């Protein structure tokens, strides 16, 4: 039987990394206890740090975990991790994350972690690794690892640690200082180069303006002169004269003169009367001219203000038109009701019923009064609305006078017009209708 048995171990909190390749359990006998070591622990040291190794801060490469112990024999589990040359940084990241997870579970269960890993591999064997880790918690920490491996076997490592509230590593401070110095040196060199370029090319500009005005003709002339000079051995002068604006201003606008023709006549009386009329005309013309000069020129309205005024006027027009249209619509509805009342009023059978029955007469008069009040309540400024309203009110009042006449002792304010149809005609029509009915009954009996 062999002394080495292979099995896989799984961490209950974190899964095992891919770099862990083999494990073995050794059950030593009493013969091998005297020897110092019987296991070949050849581990590839990729980083080649001088002792003490900085990787010892995270965890030793080989761990001995005691499984079982008895007075007769001891059993130990030997975990052997072989680091492949292709994944050194991955192993380091896994070990750091393992330690951080265990530490965060004990200290601060709520902690945010961020990891960034970049890897560049070239065909000649050159490799570059960059690893950054940020931990947010009560103590914010930041780790950075940069590794460069060239094909010839040269290796470069940079390890920086930042802890807020604590101290930074000396290497990180030195690197930051060097970077700042390099940036300052570059900025100074760029500024000096720009100064040299500017010295070679210098430009100066002169701007002059001349304004001339002639009051006699009312013309104003503007001349602009631009002078540009460039530094160095060669200097050039450019003069440009442009007359851009010629504004003709008139001091006063001459008013149109009125010509008055005077006809001389022989008669003195006519001359005296015409002379007075001429004097009055001159006085009125002078007065109109003085008023115009006091008012001044007609100021042009800006487009925005003009647009606002137009909108206001149009809105007022729309409001007036909508009111008049609403009034006309109400009058049309009232006119349909008036046609119904008119048809029933001109029906002789219904008129005889009104004359006999007081309740029906009261109902008909109430209808007329309601329609009269509705027509009277309609308001409108338009001429059409007022004319239609007046004609309908007059007709309804006349119908009401016939159906329900008022007593003679009424006041002048409550006076209404009488209907044009006298009562005698109604009585004659009633008598004729009665005779016709009697004749019809007699013919049926025969």
Swiss-Prot record:
A single BP term in Gene Ontology: cellular response to cold
Phenotype seen when the gene is deleted: Susceptibility to heat and cold stress.
Record comment regarding domains: IQ domain mediates interaction with calmodulin.
Annotated function: Co-chaperone that regulates diverse cellular pathways, such as programmed cell death and stress responses. Necessary for the proper maintenance of the unfolded protein response (UPR) during heat and cold tolerance.
Protein name, UniProt field: BAG family molecular chaperone regulator 7
Species per Swiss-Prot/TrEMBL record: Arabidopsis thaliana (Mouse-ear cress)
Domain of life: Eukaryota
Modification Phosphothreonine, positions: 443
């Amino acid at each position: 039987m062999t002394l080495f048995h292979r099995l896989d171990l799984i961490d209950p909190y974190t899964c095992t990394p891919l770099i862990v390749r083999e494990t073995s359990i050794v059950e030593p006998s009493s013969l091998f206890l005297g020897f110092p070591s019987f296991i070949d622990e050849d581990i590839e040291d990729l980083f080649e740090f001088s002792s003490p190794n900085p990787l010892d801060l995270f965890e030793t490469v080989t761990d001995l975990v005691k499984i079982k112990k008895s007075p007769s024999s001891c059993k130990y589990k030997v975990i052997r991790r072989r680091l492949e040359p292709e994944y050194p940084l991955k192993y380091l990241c896994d070990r750091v994350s393992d330690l951080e997870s265990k530490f965060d579970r004990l200290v601060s269960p709520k902690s945010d972690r961020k990891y960034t890993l970049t890897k560049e591999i070239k065909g000649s064997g050159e490799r570059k690794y960059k690893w950054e880790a940020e931990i947010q918690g009560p103590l914010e920490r930041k780790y950075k690892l940069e590794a460069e491996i060239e094909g010839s076997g040269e290796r470069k490592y940079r390890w920086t640690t930042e802890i807020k509230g604590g101290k930074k590593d000396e290497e990180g401070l030195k690197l930051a200082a060097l970077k700042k110095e390099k940036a300052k040196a570059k900025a100074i060199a760029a500024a000096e180069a720009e100064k040299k370029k500017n010295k070679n090319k210098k430009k100066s500009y002169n701007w002059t303006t001349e304004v001339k005005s002639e009051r006699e003709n009312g013309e104003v002339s503007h001349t602009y002169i631009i002078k540009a000079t460039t530094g160095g051995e060669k200097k050039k002068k450019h003069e440009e004269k442009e007359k851009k604006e010629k504004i003709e201003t008139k001091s006063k606008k001459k008013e149109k003169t009125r010509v008055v023709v005077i006809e001389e006549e022989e008669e003195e009386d006519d001359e005296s009367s015409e002379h007075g009329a001429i004097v009055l005309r001159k006085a009125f013309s002078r007065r109109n001219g003085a008023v115009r000069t006091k008012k001044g020129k007609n100021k042009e309205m800006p487009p925005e203000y003009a647009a606002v005024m137009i909108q206001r006027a149009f809105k007022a027009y729309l409001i007036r038109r909508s009111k008049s249209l609403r009034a006309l619509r109400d009058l049309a509805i009232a006119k349909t009701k008036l046609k119904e009342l008119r048809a029933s009023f001109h029906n002789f059978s219904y008129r005889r019923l009104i004359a006999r029955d007081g309740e029906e007469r009261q109902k008909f008069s109430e209808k007329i009064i309601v329609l009269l009040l509705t027509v009277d309540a309609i308001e409108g400024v338009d001429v059409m609305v007022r004319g239609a309203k007046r004609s309908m009110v007059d007709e309804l009042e006349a119908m009401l006078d016939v159906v329900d006449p008022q007593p003679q002792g009424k006041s002048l304010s409550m006076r209404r017009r009488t209907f044009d149809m006298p009562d005698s005609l109604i009585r004659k029509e009633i008598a004729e209708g009665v005779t016709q009915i009697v004749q019809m009954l007699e013919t049926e009996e025969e």
